[in-house]
Amino acid sequence: MAQHRRTLEYPVSKIDRELLNAVYELDYGKVQTALDNGADPNCLDEKGTHIIWSAIGIFSEYQDKFDRRQHKVKRENAEAILSLLLSYGSDPDGGITASDTKHSTPLMEVCYYLEIRIAKLFLQYGADVNHVNDGHTWLDHLYDENMFMEFRRDDNNEDKDELDDRQRRLDRMFALAEAHEAEYFKNLNKNEKE
């Protein structure tokens, strides 16, 4: 007798399905309507994937300089939708808990793609900067990327303009990390004095 494997599927309510579809379509108006009508900003799709991961998916698709320019409107829509979801209480860690050390957080993911404005959003909404994935924090991922850039510069097959653009974005991401860390310690010292 053949055994049939049943894939675990998570139930998705009608209003959450509308929200998920609107995010997939990058339709800000429909996202707003679904949220206003009670959709869960922390809903999961049928596979159990948190909606934040769907919202940042566009940034992994269009990575090189040409693609980023070509798909500027899509990227801007995705950023606006992500901001809206977060403002409605969506988890900036995309359902990843501190005890889950096998998965990266959305902040780590956008750092990998050097999406500074998206990283700022996650930091603004309280993303876990201390999360460790395979022994690395989001800052460790930036340092790894910086080291990788050195190897790529030594490779004569790489497009110099593309590498320069990536290095500029990496430098801006480090500046964001330093500013965030400085703000954290400033607030920590302020709280200790009180």
Language-model segment annotations:
Residues 30, 77-81, 117-118, 166-173:
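Conserved ankyrin/ankyrin-like repeat signature
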Residues 53-56, 74-75, 79-100:
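Alpha-helical adaptor scaffolds
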Residues 2-14, 125, 143-194:
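Ankyrin-repeat-protein effector appendages
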Residues 24, 67, 71-78, 163, ...:
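Flexible, glycine- and charge-enriched loops at secondary-structure boundaries
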Residues 9-21, 44-69, 95-109, 132-148, ...:
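Ankyrin-repeat boundary/"N-cap" motif
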Residues 32-40, 82-92, 120-128, 174-183:
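Ankyrin repeat domain, specifically the short helix-to-loop turn at the C-terminus of the second helix
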